[in-house]
Each structure stands twice: as structure tokens, then as C-alpha cells.
Amino acid sequence: MATVISAGELIDGVGGGTCQIAGTLFAASFFAGMEVLDRRPHTRPSGYIKMGLDATVVYPSINLRMRNNLPFPVVIHRRIGNGVLRIELLGARSERTVTFVRKIMPRVDRFEELSVPDANLPAGMRVLTQRGIPGFRITRYRIIRENDVAVRERWQDAYPPTSQIWRVGTGAALTGPIPRQDDHPEYTADQYLAVTQLAGTNEMQEVRRPGFSGAAGWMVREGL
């Protein structure tokens, strides 16, 4: 049991968390330089992985497919501990360097604010059950360098806005459990991000430029 997205809202459901596994596997395969056959982004940015490295799976219609186009087989090794999943692709030593670059487009889409009547809550009580997230459009690149050759791939992703949802009491008194409040902070993401997997190591290097969307308070500054 973990959170799933249903009708635009996060709820607990059977099979929840599969996208976390898919996103982690996609990121590992991406930095290994594997061929991307089929991958779709989430319907909203995720807090557990960088925007642009996430992946969605929904049985049986949406899948994640990567192809090992390396000249050697690989082993998928996964570790789970303290609520953290780590996936490694193990194979022969490679001299390739892989860089992920993400740029957030300047125009973002405003999110809706919805009020949902709740007869279990007393009149006048309001509970924020889902914090809104604006809609983003991003361009992402993968640059693979090996010896004197560099190959660049380019994709575009769109994340629709996530509605902000308030549960609004309409009853005479509290007659049920209070809905869980969404305590997540405002969503921020660096407008420019570059992550490089260095050749032959597990070391990653990051270059960040916050831009308009990477610092707290950006939604107010952007009039959202």
C-alpha cells in the first residue's frame, strides 16, 4: 500500500510506489547510456527524483522500456534500506561520460484551487489536502561522450498543473477523522540543471542555476 494518483489526487492504493521503482530504474539506465524505447513522465513533478528523470508505469497501458545497446551484458542490482531504493547497473568498465541536462521553459501554467465539501468536518473548517503545483514544460538532453565522439539526444516533457485541494467543512460537528494535511513545502526546481556521471566511477557532478523557479517564494514572484 502506497500513494497513487487517482482523479488528480494522491491517495493510498494497492500498487502504489511502482513509479518510484520505474523512475529509479530509468535514471540508472539513462546514465548507463542505454537506448530509451518507451518512457513517459509522471503527471506531476515528484519529490523523490529530479524532474525529467521520472518514469510512469500503469498496467497494462503505459510501460517503461529500455534496450541494452552496450557491447556487454549488465546485471540489475537493487538495494532497499531505510525507505530508500538504490538501483545499480553492473557491467564491464566503460570510458563513456553521460550528462543529463534539464531546462525549464519560462512559461508555467497556473494551478486550479478546488474546494471539496466535507460533511464530516464542522462548517468553516478548512484542511489543505493537496498543495498545488504549477504546470511545467522542460527540454532535456543526454550527452554521451566517449573518446573523441559526443552524441546528443533531445526530448521534451510536459507536466500539467496539479490542483490545490481544500476540504471544506459543511457539517454541524466533527463526525469523522480529520483528513491528512499536505505539509509539503512549495515545489521548487532549478531552471537549469546538469548532472554528469563520470566515466568508470559512481561519482556524479551537478551544476545548478536556480533561475526563476529554483528558490522559495518563486510562485508569488511569478504571480502564481
Whereabouts are the PLM-identified features?
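Well-ordered beta-sheet/strand-loop patches within structured domains
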Residues: 1-224
